[in-house]
Amino acid sequence: MIYIVYVVILLLTFCSCQQEGGQEGLEFDCTTSNVDDWGKHINIEECLPLEYPDSLGLGDAYKCVIGGGRMVYWDYSRKELFSYSTDGRYLGKIGAEGRSKSEYIGIKDIFLDKDGERLYVLDELGILSYDMKTGEFVSREKPELPDFHEYWKFAVLSTGHYLLFNPQPHGSGTVIDYHDGEWKDLRKAGFFQLACERFYYSGNQLCVISDYGDFFIDTYRDGGLSRAVTFKFSNPLPEEKKPRDFRSFGRIAEERDWCKCIRDACETKRWIFANVEGSEQKLHWVFGDRKTGKALFGLMNLDDGLQVVGGDEDCFYGILSPEMVSDKSYLKDWVKASHSEEEPQPMLVKFRVRDED
């Protein structure tokens, strides 16, 4: 009887170890790739000028979210949210800034649900939701959290169920799971960090980007986080260098030898994109290929003027600033063919990564 129990325990332990190993997911080795011309690896499908919402035009995009055939453009200078179709057509304004219940004030983050039907806005006072088809206000909620004003990024799982990110956790988790007045830590870390992007949907799966000094992407499942993707760099920030407070963060931020963090990420069915703050305090791009397990890694070229903002099943999307595109860029001919030099409005770029196999 004792022998049988012992064998059962061994089997359970083995199964548990197998399950944990499976949760490690993909690892992309970025130490052997050094892309110096992204034009050799990117196929442009479309490059479309965005229609102006009015005579004031468009300012710089602080953030864009894409889903359900639509894009929300957060105009930082105008403090407004505009809805577009993914062919560049202006669809309307979403909400407005103000003091009423239906208006946002001091936007911190925006998040689109997995179906692309509802936009959520995190502002100084709570979480608002808007219908993507009409742009009309739907609801407002303020999670019952101490120090709610310290949360800067969020994701929506369902009504009253959110993940929230605090860059200065003061002993609590950087990422918490809040559901109808109750919450728990999902990721415990005492490091001071940037309020970079933290959450995005890939299909029906909610993805959670790692904290400052780490380089992985988790998925949220069954009330916890499971490792989905890990990126390997030749010069990751050492554990002892991770900033514990604002002063040490300022010092580490000035050091030029290390990869610091993942600033943003998105996915297609095959490819995983990450925007990484690398050495020399410069941004680098990673495109990891699920099919081959290989990664493309290289410096983001500022002369291309392209910012990757999202993905769907087959393609990535980016916002192109025509005035930043140099004559050496692979995008210059698209700009000349698609827009007026007298009125350089932002452009929506749809592209694929070329197969490397």
Residue ranges and their predicted role:
Residues 66-68, 112-115, 156-159, 201-203, ...:
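Residue-level detector of Asp-centered blade-edge/turn motifs that repeat once per structural unit
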Residues 252-296, 304-306:
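Loop/turn-rich, solvent-exposed surfaces of beta-rich toroidal or solenoidal domains
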Residues 48-79:
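Beta-strand-rich domains and repeat architectures in extracellular enzymes and scaffolds
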